[in-house]
Swiss-Prot record:
This is Large ribosomal subunit protein uL29. GO terms for molecular function: structural constituent of ribosome. GO terms for cellular component: ribonucleoprotein complex; ribosome. GO terms for biological process: translation. The lineage of its organism: Bacteria, Pseudomonadati, Campylobacterota, Epsilonproteobacteria, Campylobacterales. Coiled coil: none annotated. Keywords: Ribonucleoprotein, Ribosomal protein. Belongs to the universal ribosomal protein uL29 family. Gene3D superfamilies: 1.10.287.310. InterPro entries: Ribosomal_uL29, Ribosomal_uL29_CS, Ribosomal_uL29_sf.
């Protein structure tokens, strides 16, 4: 996911995406703790996606 893709979306859609990514992050962390996650770098990617969405949201609010 690139910031350019997020820039064109509206606030409601960004908030929906943020909620989905946060729930996905929770699931991946749970899998990590129970030793079911095969690729721990997925957590890093999801965290960066959340940061991009938050940046796009704050840019829209200004």
């Amino acid at each position: 996911m690139k910031f350019i893709d997020l820039k064109d979306k509206d606030i409601a859609e960004l908030q929906k995406m943020l909620k989905e990514k946060k729930s996905l992050l929770f699931e991946k962390r749970l899998q990590l703790k129970t030793m079911q996650l095969t690729n721990p770098s997925e957590i890093k990617v999801i965290r960066k996606d959340i940061a991009r969405i938050n940046t796009a949201l704050s840019a829209k609010k200004d």
